């Protein structure tokens, strides 16, 4: 196996046995691909902005004299880059410019004579852009647009499963759902009539739709019924016989022909009878005359002499009608064929219930239902019906909808119009009637072939189209009104509605969410989340069990494990590791193709529909060397059912064992040994892990840690290979390899690192270089670690030495006992950065001012402020300290204009100001790490703002100069090579100024040309950098675009270092969570025979009932892995030769039957030394899920490092030194510190703010509220008879306003008495009763 440069530094031993057919695809592609589709120019005009423009333009004026056409669009460059946008609190977006063409026709000339054409580029608002990591920066905060799982457009056949009607009869229905437009529903009622609803309004007989499509009764009956023909011969009736139609009927008369009785009267007709009739080729039988009574005429029968209708279509026959018909000379009579089994008379019955007679009356009926109360006219009724399903402006099935529609009603082709036509509607009714007749199945709505993914691009496009449609109306009106000769396209378009629609979507849509930025995993998972909620989706309250449940088609597409606990369970899902979206938006998953029992490496992506009938083997099926199945019978899936299949029948095979689950669940080692509920908690809690001060890779991992870390974008990854030229804390410079150069560039890549910035969750984002100068790197290598990554691997927590044993009740109910050593070594110390901001506004009484001159504040309180009134960087502050001094004018009276004038002339200071400074919140203390000042354009900058500006300019200049020097050096080095090759002596060159080299003239023309090219490049480079600096300078010095009424904003960043302490929540990766109960001195912790104490003691009772055995295996494996590190340390202590290390390492990596081949001999001595150095803390191990290390391998590894195979050690009590009576399971578990810190939750109140109406204290930490003494607590005091305690609880401690002020005063005076009065809530009750019109008065006791 080939390892990249970073991977060689620390090779993870892989216990996986199945070969890796397919690497996990790029994890954020669902976001990036979708958005790229949205903004890229699409010549077909099917997707993105192009599609939106084409669907709205051209816009015709009402009078037809002019139209506005769309030509093309382009997105300009964004003004600020992502980092600048985050600092300034603005949206990262690009201006959209659209080229429009206004065509004016000559109204006096014949039709369509063009009078004038004007083209112009028009600004159409800003389009937020996606960053490289799949997020959007909206108003300075990073947000993610979550993809939505919604019902695919198309037609769905469903039933109510017998729940609607009391009889329990199953009623079937069909629903045509367009991508946009009105829904069309067909449904049966309990009497088997077919009804139609439009947009879920009141129902009408379904035949009204057919009548509105201009069908007569005869045509309607023709469409849905077969006919039976009777011939009238000399007083007898002969019936045309199709034997198949008789099955299941009971003969009411003898069925005979040619003198032979086939079925006696009263007998049921069976398949045997039908076979005999078919065999004897019987085509007609005689039937009694009354057999036709009750049958239904298929068309009108007219007496040709008189012109009167004897019997109308859809009327039932009587004997009288029969007589009239034979009198009128009819020899053949056609009736509808119906029976109770599989040819119901539904449409015929519905026609009888339908009161309409022709097209107009049907249209009027539909109009009345859609627009009740409006008087219908013929034109209005026609226009309404036309616009409902047949107009492209109002109705669109979309490509997906048409594809699903056609496949649902059994057509072969995928294409078709976006609107419906009459055949579509008739086919839907036909299929619904077939289903009612028992032919065909209803659809499964939860099948992933019926639900599709709507991603960012598509949702943004829809919003954009909404904005365009709003603009369209305005444009139409302006075109009809204005003087068209003077008007330009720019005057017609108002960009506001468009940008408003887009802004609203990105800023406040339910699916635009504040990014979860706790750690790299939570970022990745958030971007891969699939929600069924949101606009056009489900609501929590309405969603039943079926929608939330795991469906067979989720296999390899949506994760069955990772979903929130609580009301959203099952509605919010996560994409499986290998899942992708196809062009229609359906989820696909990869499978290896199996050809004639041979498993190939060809991978096909199948959607849930395509997967339908295939037989698919699991990834852990045993294969032979040749790639065929080893066993005769193989566990495989077909149509969602698992079973045993012969190996010849297998058509596909899973690509990987973690194909079923999401990324977060694939990070849990030994997942296969955990109960699903606990695995769910484990997957969810990894997302809440806070990045620790020193990241520590998991000793026991699953091998995909590197994928997550690199794809999340928190690490710096080499874009091209090369050699590291220089490294410091904030930048890495790489000289690119010759073969990867683009001709004519300097060949230097510069990576600027992010230092100590704040994440959305207030954790700290910081990148640290992992490479040294002179090291070779290849493309894709990790150059710098981000938060929670260690040498390019995800590292969410710390490897802790744990023991499973009770310890004095300190681990009762999942509590955790932690050693003091963990605190001393800062293992779980985390840095949290808070942003506090102070805004100076313009008020009615004058403007607020940021200043150090604050009334009634002592010197001590101002000690940390500079002369501008802003805190120094590096100051240590605690609760209540002033960070930014600010005063607000408080005016008793509004100034008269005269006074204002005098003030303006003599510059008198505002009469009266009050202190409104920004202070540190009560429970917070920390260090100031950064201050930023934003000043409105036109307001003079204060001293501090100018200092910050100078500093930023200096930094920018330094950065740009250094970058220029590096690139210049690269270019001049190439010049030197060229000159030396041309024969210029090196001594001379070194004596000259380097820039003069470019002025040398060479004899060889080709070389001279090359030199001139390089000189040209040098000039270009210089010009580019000057321009770059100028742009940067402009950005830094220009005023900021602040909200209206805001003069200045000061943002202060405060870093808090939080050590672990009792009350913090910790967890393992298997759903084993708990709260720290005590930090124990090291000397009291249990220790082993070598004297090594454990770090954490966990309760063994937390394992059996929760069935997460994975944690036990992880602990044993961790012990073995750490054992390898200890062994290496011992060998280093003994100063053994390098070849012994090589042998030991080879032995370790060869252990077990694994797919991994590590050849230690192929590594250079330096590489082996680096590897040894990185393995001293333990050997990192990968046990992929469902393909992990077996028990035997764990025992083998334990044996190799001289540890007991049981994984249990003899422990001694740290307090007494006595041995515990049984060996204890000790090992290493990867523990996480979750973002539920006791510091954020602890809260106490003495006095504080009160609610306005009830006058009771507020609740919650944010409001500095009190503890609620609720109903049940009152009952408890009542039960104890504690009357006085109860009285003070209900009065002075709560809402007796006078009582509590008096009591406060008494306490100050040292007099501890209370006088309870009337609680305010009682007054509220009185007022409420009075508001009902009942007067209630309190009488004083005389």
UniProtKB/Swiss-Prot annotation:
Coiled coil: none annotated. One of its GO terms (cellular component) is DNA-directed RNA polymerase complex. It catalyses: RNA(n) + a ribonucleoside 5'-triphosphate = RNA(n+1) + diphosphate. The keyword Nucleotidyltransferase applies. Pfam families: RNA_pol_Rpb2_1, RNA_pol_Rpb2_2, RNA_pol_Rpb2_3, RNA_pol_Rpb2_45, RNA_pol_Rpb2_6, RNA_pol_Rpb2_7. It comes from the Bacteria. It is an enzyme of class 2 (transferase). CDD domains: RNA_pol_B_RPB2 (cd00653). GO terms for molecular function: DNA binding; DNA-directed RNA polymerase activity; ribonucleoside binding. Keywords: DNA-directed RNA polymerase, Nucleotidyltransferase, Transcription, Transferase. GO terms for biological process: DNA-templated transcription. Its EC number is 2.7.7.6. SUPFAM superfamilies: beta and beta-prime subunits of DNA dependent RNA-polymerase. The keyword Transmembrane does not apply. InterPro entries: DNA-dir_RNA_pol_bsu_ext_1_sf (IPR042107), DNA-dir_RNA_pol_bsu_external_1 (IPR019462), DNA-dir_RNA_pol_su2 (IPR015712), DNA-dir_RNAP_su2_dom (IPR007120), DNA-dir_RNAP_su2_hyb_sf (IPR037033), RNA_pol_bsu_bac (IPR010243), RNA_pol_bsu_CS (IPR007121), RNA_pol_bsu_protrusion (IPR007644). The RNAP catalytic core consists of 2 alpha, 1 beta, 1 beta' and 1 omega subunit. When a sigma factor is associated with the core the holoenzyme is formed, which can initiate transcription. Belongs to the RNA polymerase beta chain family. DNA-dependent RNA polymerase catalyzes the transcription of DNA into RNA using the four ribonucleoside triphosphates as substrates. This is DNA-directed RNA polymerase subunit beta. It comes from Aliivibrio fischeri (strain MJ11). The gene is rpoB.
């Amino acid at each position: 196996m080939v390892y990249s440069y970073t991977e060689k530094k620390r090779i993870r031993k892989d216990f996986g046995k199945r070969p890796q057919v397919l690497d996990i695809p790029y994890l954020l592609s669902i976001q990036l691909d979708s958005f790229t589709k949205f903004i890229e120019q699409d010549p077909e005009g099917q997707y993105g902005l192009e599609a939106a423009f084409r669907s709205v333009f051209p816009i015709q004026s009402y009078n037809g004299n002019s139209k506005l056409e769309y030509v093309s669009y382009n997105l300009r460059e964004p003004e600020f880059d992502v980092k600048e946008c985050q600092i300034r609190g603005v949206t990262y977006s690009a201006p959209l410019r659209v080229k429009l063409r206004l065509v004016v026709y000559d109204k006096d000339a014949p039709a369509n004579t063009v009078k004038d054409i004007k083209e112009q580029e028009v600004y159409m608002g800003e389009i937020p852009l996606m960053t490289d990591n799949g997020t959007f920066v909206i108003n300075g905060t990073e947000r993610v647009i979550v993809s939505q799982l919604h019902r695919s457009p198309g037609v769905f056949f469903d039933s109510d499963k017998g729940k609607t009607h009391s009889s329990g009869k199953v009623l079937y229905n069909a629903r045509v759902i367009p991508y946009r437009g009105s829904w069309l529903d067909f449904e049966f009622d309990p009497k088997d009539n077919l009804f139609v609803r439009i947009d879920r309004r009141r129902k009408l007989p379904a035949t009204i739709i057919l009548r509105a499509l201009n069908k007569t009764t005869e045509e309607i009956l023709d469409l849905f019924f077969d006919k039976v023909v009777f011939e009238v011969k000399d007083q007898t009736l002969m019936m045309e016989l199709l034997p198949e139609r008789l099955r299941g009927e009971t003969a009411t008369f003898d069925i005979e022909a040619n003198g032979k009785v086939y079925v006696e009267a009263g007998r049921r007709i069976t398949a045997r009878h039908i076979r005999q009739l078919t065999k004897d080729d019987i085509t007609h039988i005689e039937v009694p005359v009354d057999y036709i009574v009750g049958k239904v005429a298929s068309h009108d029968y007219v007496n040709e002499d008189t012109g009167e209708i004897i019997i109308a279509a859809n009327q039932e026959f009587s004997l009288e009608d029969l007589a009239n018909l034979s009198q009128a000379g009819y020899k053949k009579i056609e009736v509808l064929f119906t029976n109770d089994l599989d040819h119901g008379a539904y449409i015929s019955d519905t026609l009888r219930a339908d009161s309409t007679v022709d097209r107009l009356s049907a249209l009027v009926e539909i109009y009345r239902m859609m627009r009740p109360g409006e008087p219908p006219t013929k034109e209005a009724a026609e226009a309404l019906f036309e616009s409902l399903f047949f107009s492209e402006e109002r109705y669109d099935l979309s490509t997906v909808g048409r594809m699903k529609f056609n496949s649902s009603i059994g057509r072969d082709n995928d294409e078709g119009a976006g609107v419906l036509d009459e055949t579509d509607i008739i086919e839907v009714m036909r299929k619904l009637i077939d289903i009612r007749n028992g032919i065909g199945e209803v659809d499964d709505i939860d099948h992933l072939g019926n639900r599709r993914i709507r991603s960012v691009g598509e949702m943004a496009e829809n919003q954009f189209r909404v904005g365009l449609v709003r603009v369209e109306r305005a444009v139409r009106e302006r075109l009809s009104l204005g003087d068209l000769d003077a008007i330009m396209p720019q005057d017609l378009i108002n960009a506001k509605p468009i940008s408003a629609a887009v802004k609203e979507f990105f800023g406040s849509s339910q699916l635009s969410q504040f990014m979860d930025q706790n750690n790299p995993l939570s970022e990745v998972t958030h971007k891969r989340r699939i929600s069924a909620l949101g606009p056009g989706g489900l609501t929590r309250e309405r969603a039943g069990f079926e929608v939330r449940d795991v469906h067979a088609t989720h296999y390899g597409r949506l994760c069955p494990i990772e979903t929130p606990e609580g009301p959203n369970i099952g509605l919010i899902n996560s994409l499986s590791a290998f899942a992708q979206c196809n062009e229609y938006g359906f989820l696909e998953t990869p499978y290896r193709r199996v050809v004639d029992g041979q498993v190939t490496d060809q991978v096909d992506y199948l959607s849930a529909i395509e997967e339908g009938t295939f037989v698919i083997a699991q990834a852990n099926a045993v294969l032979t060397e040749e790639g065929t199945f080893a066993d005769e019978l193989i566990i495989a899936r077909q149509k969602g059912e698992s079973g045993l299949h012969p190996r010849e029948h297998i058509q596909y095979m899973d690509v990987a064992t973690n194909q079923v689950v999401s990324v977060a669940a694939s990070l849990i080692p030994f997942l296969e040994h955990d109960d699903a509920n606990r695995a769910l908690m484990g997957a969810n809690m990894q997302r809440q892990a806070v990045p620790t001060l020193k990241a520590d890779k998991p000793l026991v991992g699953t091998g995909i840690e590197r994928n997550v870390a690199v794809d999340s974008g928190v690490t710096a990854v080499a874009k091209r290979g090369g050699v590291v030229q220089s490294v410091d804390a904030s930048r890495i410079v790489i000289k690119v390899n010759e073969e990867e150069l683009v001709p004519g560039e300097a060949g230097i890549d510069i990576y600027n690192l992010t230092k100590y910035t704040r994440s959305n969750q207030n954790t700290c984002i910081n990148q640290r270089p992992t490479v040294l100068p002179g090291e070779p790197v290849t493309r894709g290598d990790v150059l710098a670690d981000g938060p929670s990554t260690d040498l390019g691997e995800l590292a969410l927590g710390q490897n802790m030495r744990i023991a499973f044993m009770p310890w004095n009740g300190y681990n009762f109910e999942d509590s955790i006992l932690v050693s003091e050593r963990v605190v001393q070594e800062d293992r779980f110390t985390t840095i949290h950065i808070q942003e506090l901001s102070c805004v100076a506004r313009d008020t009615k009484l004058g403007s607020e001012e940021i200043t150090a001159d604050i009334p009634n504040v002592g010197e001590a309180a101002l000690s940390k402020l500079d002369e501008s009134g802003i805190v120094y960087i590096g100051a240590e502050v605690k609760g209540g300290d002033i960070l930014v001094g600010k005063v607000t004018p408080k005016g008793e009276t509004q100034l008269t204009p005269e006074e204002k004038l005098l003030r303006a002339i003599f510059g008198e200071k505002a009469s009266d100001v009050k202190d409104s400074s920004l202070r540190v919140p009560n429970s917070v203390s920390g260090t100031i790490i950064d201050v930023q000042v934003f000043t409105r354009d036109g307001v003079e900058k204060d001293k501090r703002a100018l200092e910050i500006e100078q500093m930023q300019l200096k930094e920018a200049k330094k950065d740009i100069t250094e970058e220029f020097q590096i690139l210049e050096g690269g270019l001049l080095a190439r010049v030197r090579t060229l000159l030396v090759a041309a024969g210029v002596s090196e001594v001379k060159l070194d004596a000259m100024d380097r820039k003069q080299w470019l002025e040398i003239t060479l004899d060889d023309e080709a070389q001279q040309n090359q030199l001139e090219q390089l000189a040209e490049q040098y000039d270009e480079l210089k010009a580019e950098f000057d321009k770059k600096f100028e742009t940067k300078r402009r950005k830094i010095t220009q005023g900021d675009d602040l909200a209206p009424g805001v003069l200045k904003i000061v943002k202060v960043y405060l870093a808090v270092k939080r050590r672990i302490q009792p009350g913090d929540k910790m967890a393992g990766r298997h759903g084993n969570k708990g709260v720290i109960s005590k930090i124990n001195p090291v000397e009291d912790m249990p220790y082993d025979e070598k004297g090594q104490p454990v770090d954490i003691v966990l309760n063994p009772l937390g394992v059996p009932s929760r069935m997460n055995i994975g944690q036990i295996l992880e602990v044993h494996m961790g012990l073995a892995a750490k054992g390898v590190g200890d062994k290496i340390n011992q060998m280093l202590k003994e100063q053994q030769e390098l070849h012994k290390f090589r042998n030991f390492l080879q032995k370790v990596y060869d252990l077990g039957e694994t797919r991994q081949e590590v050849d230690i001999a192929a590594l250079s001595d330096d590489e082996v030394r680096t590897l040894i150095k990185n393995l001293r803390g333990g050997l990192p191990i990968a046990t992929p899920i469902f393909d992990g290390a077996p028990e035997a391998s764990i025992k083998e590894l334990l044996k190799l490092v001289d540890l007991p195979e049981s994984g249990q050690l003899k422990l001694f009590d740290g307090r007494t030194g006595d041995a515990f009576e049984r060996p204890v399971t000790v090992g290493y578990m990867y523990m996480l510190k979750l973002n539920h810190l006791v510091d954020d939750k602890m809260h106490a109140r003495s006095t504080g703010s009160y609610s306005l109406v009830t006058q009771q204290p507020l609740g919650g930490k944010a409001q500095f509220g009190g503890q609620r003494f609720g109903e049940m607590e009152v009952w408890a005091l009542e039960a104890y008879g504690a009357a006085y305690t109860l009285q003070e609880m209900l009065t002075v401690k709560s809402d007796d306003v006078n009582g509590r002020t008096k009591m406060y005063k008494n306490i100050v005076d040292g007099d501890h008495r209370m006088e309870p009065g009337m609680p305010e809530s009682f007054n509220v009750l009185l007022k409420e009763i009075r508001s009902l019109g009942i007067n209630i008065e309190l009488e004083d006791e005389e």
